[in-house]
Amino acid sequence: ESQAVARVFPDGVPCSSTKPMTGHTLGAAGALEAAFCWLSLTHGNTLAPHVWDGQADPALPALRWVTPGQTLALTPQRCLMSNSFAFGGNNVSLIIGDAP
């Protein structure tokens, strides 16, 4: 996933994972992450911080991990992407943002 993000998005796009804060909720994971995205857009632009051990994998591209208190850039049309990859190849990328 990090390789795809590094190829598709510009350098410096904020990245995070909510699973360390919620646990492995299986079928509810996508709904929870969508709720985090919606909250970021509607309550002060605060992004969910990336909680991790700080040990980057040198085989993967460096990404800009969201830090506590970091906010979404104020742009004319804000949007967030939530990726959900599940058992059996059930995958989805949900884009949530301001109406045009």
Regions inferred by a protein language model and the residue ranges of each:
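Structural signature of cysteine-dependent C-C bond-forming condensing enzymes
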Residues: S2-M21, A29-A86, G97-P100
